A protein has these predicted regions:
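Short Lys/Arg-rich amphipathic alpha-helical segments
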Residues: 1-157
């Protein structure tokens, strides 16, 4: 299994076992769904989501079988993961982390391999050498055969 980090448990909320997750993950609507499985901590202990709501900047989750704050306190400070195989995206969506290692082109010109995907508040950003490319439809033309084609935007390269 390949795990994708989707956030960190920063605290509990109330006394009924609800936890606060701080997450910048782009596809929250596909992850934080009742019945989905999340993995927590270094040991990747699995939990089933019982409820979800968004509150201020936090993703608030309860897990099946946990109804008391004392049962979830030990999770505080742990990272939360989803199994990549469980992450089902819409037809044309690709999880940005999968793009690492893809070749990047502006038109027919090869500009390098995608080295890293930065999770920024506005959008994910693809790092190709010293070039940073926002992972938004205005910049990405198409993705196929392990290649990403980006628009030739003045000042980008």
């Amino acid at each position: 299994m390949k795990f994708i980090n989707v956030g960190k448990i920063v605290n509990t909320h109330g006394i009924k076992g609800e936890i606060r997750i701080l997450s910048k993950f782009r596809h929250k609507d596909k992850v934080f769904v009742k019945g989905n499985k999340l993995y927590v901590g270094k040991k990747k202990e699995d939990f089933i989501i019982n409820s979800y709501r968004y509150h201020k900047i936090f993703d608030m989750v309860t897990f099946e079988g946990f109804t008391n704050i004392n049962e979830v306190l030990y999770l505080k400070g742990e990272f939360v993961y989803v199994n990549e195989e469980d992450l089902i995206l819409d037809n044309n969506e690709i999880y940005s982390g999968k793009l690492i290692g893809y070749d990047c082109y502006v038109g027919d010109k090869y500009i390098g391999k995608i080295e890293e995907v930065l999770n920024e508040p506005a959008s994910d950003v693809l790092k190709v050498g010293k070039v940073l490319i926002p992972y938004v439809k205005e910049f990405i033309i198409k993705i196929e055969d392990n290649k990403v084609y980006v628009k030739d935007v003045r000042g980008l390269i």
